[in-house]
Amino acid sequence: MSKNPYEIEIIQKTAPYHPDPTMIFNHLCASRPGTLLLETAEVNKKRDLESIMIIDSAMRISSEDNSVKLTPLSINGTDILSTLKKTIPKKIEIYEKNNSTILVFPKIKKNIDEDKKLFSLSVFDAFRLMIRIFENREKKSKAMFFGGLFSYDLISVFESLPKLKGNQKCSNFCFYLAETLLVLDHQKKTCLIQNSLFSKNLKERKRIKKRSVEIERKLNEKLKLIPKTKIKDINLTSNMNNFEYGTIIKKLQKLIQKGEIFQVVPSRKFYLPCPNPLSAYQKLKKSNPSPYMFFMQDQDFTLFGASPESSLKYDEKTRKIELYPIAGTRPRGKTEDGNLDLDLDSRIELEMRTNHKELAEHLMLVDLARNDLARICKPGSRYVSDLVRVDRYSHVMHLVSRVIGELREGLDALHAYASCMNMGTLTGAPKVRAMQLIAEHEGEKRGSYGGAIGYFTDLGNLDTCITIRSAYVEKQVATIQAGAGIVYNSIPENEVNESLNKAQAVINAIKNAHY
């Protein structure tokens, strides 16, 4: 044991590799809450790269308004909390509720300049306080690994937006501090089990080492099949029919014509039963492999998806920060029987690439991404590394670009996320006014949709995707939300169809999983 009471002890061991992460996740986690599967793949080759699983969590960290709720899930987590409480600044109120500790942060003044707002004490500091009390002497890249989601509605803590009600239990953010990680490298075909020990408790250390051996043993077993649930009638419903959604599009277009905004992304929700989310995720991953795929099991909800779009990515070593705006969408070129017609597909791509409306919308959002980075990056460090490429998925193709900058000294990945949220491709421009209008016209919280899911570490790295092409499942009902980018010369009927096209891959996966 280390003599340093605040040093993280890392226990690592290799285990048998298996190419199917979904099967492993089911075998090790089943429906247990506080578990998470994050996966990455190459866009064009659709080849798996890495799968990271939180098998056990030491703590659940969630936020509502200006408070953060810390709930230990093991003795390991309880000891973190005991250490953390000794370091809480006086400006932060602290109280206990049931098994949780609540931190209440001062409300952020919303009429101050960007830098003052960025450096104000905020709910993000709950993570910073936790990271600062532990030493990662060996500089292991995932010693403190926080995996989870930032909801779209987190922005209301930092900006003046209409107050909305929501019928979902999704917090402003919900993260798990990993106690047991499993990392699959699909290129090297390796499997690593990693335990992070934050406690000095000898019994807890013994338990965690025993847990590592148990997981290795389970990985040598025949993997359990993912259970299936059949549903006779799967009816798709929506909170807005085509006419209602089209009416909102037309109203927002009038505001664009008046010059109030340049672009806006209204959305609508689709609902269908989903008693078996993991089976649906398995179908989605197979039919629509994407750069980012995720499956999150919380005590209140399950969230899964296959997102084409990075939200924000930060590498602490290089201090490079990336945004990946996607704007411009077309359906894939398919025949009536659903087979891909390569000639039709290429003609659709050509039409999209040369469409003035799509190009104007895309370049506007590239410019917005550049502006987002300008606030937090070193002057002269921003550049566009990829401009107007095409990425293809099972039901749609997109115009994409990549914008990169170098983060200013004194800022970290959480500062960067706070400054850039929510991504312009899910809001519009100018961003704050677009979000205000979205709130007024949609009339309810977006929850996970349009936020971000991924991870960050104590070493400062962050990798997230925008939570789109996803299903939020609560009480066995899936909510699939999708929108369309509206500009001056948008054709409302086309945008109505686009919202359904974007949701279709997830809808089909859920249906196919329950037949």
Swiss-Prot record:
Feedback inhibited by tryptophan. Binds 1 Mg(2+) ion per subunit. Its EC number is 4.1.3.27. Pathway: Amino-acid biosynthesis; L-tryptophan biosynthesis; L-tryptophan from chorismate: step 1/5. GO terms for molecular function: anthranilate synthase activity; metal ion binding. Disulfide bonds: none annotated. Chorismate binds at G328, T329, Y449, R469, G483, A484, G485. It catalyses: chorismate + L-glutamine = anthranilate + pyruvate + L-glutamate + H(+). It comes from the Bacteria. Heterotetramer consisting of two non-identical subunits: a beta subunit (TrpG) and a large alpha subunit (TrpE). Part of a heterotetrameric complex that catalyzes the two-step biosynthesis of anthranilate, an intermediate in the biosynthesis of L-tryptophan. In the first step, the glutamine-binding beta subunit (TrpG) of anthranilate synthase (AS) provides the glutamine amidotransferase activity which generates ammonia as a substrate that, along with chorismate, is used in the second step, catalyzed by the large alpha subunit of AS (TrpE) to produce anthranilate. In the absence of TrpG, TrpE can synthesize anthranilate directly from chorismate and high concentrations of ammonia. Belongs to the anthranilate synthase component I family. This is Anthranilate synthase component 1. It comes from Buchnera aphidicola subsp. Schizaphis graminum (strain Sg). The lineage of its organism: Bacteria, Pseudomonadati, Pseudomonadota, Gammaproteobacteria, Enterobacterales.
